[in-house]
Amino acid sequence: MNPIVEFCVNNLASGADAAFAKLDADDNLDVIEYDCLTYCDLCATSLFALVDGEVVRGETAEELVANIYTFLEENPF
């Protein structure tokens, strides 16, 4: 079973789309897009994804990707 990375469609429109594309190309991750993750305050102010249910943030799409991989290294299955 792969780690699950979840994105809000509104956050993708705010700039997380590049992170989504990069992570989606990784066969070791299950990357999912949802209409809403109910983190509207967070979604309006920063780029983020839920990684196995935990919030991971980044100031840029590149930082978000790096932070997600760091989170996965520090929190293996």
Curated annotation (Swiss-Prot):
NCBIfam families: PRK13669.1 (NF010190)
HAMAP family assigned: UPF0349
Native source organism of the sequence: Listeria monocytogenes serovar 1/2a (strain ATCC BAA-679 / EGD-e)
Coiled-coil features, chain-numbered ranges: none
Family: Belongs to the UPF0349 family.
One Pfam family cited in the UniProt record for this chain: DUF1450
Protein name: UPF0349 protein lmo2392
InterPro entries (UniProt xref): DUF1450, UPF0349
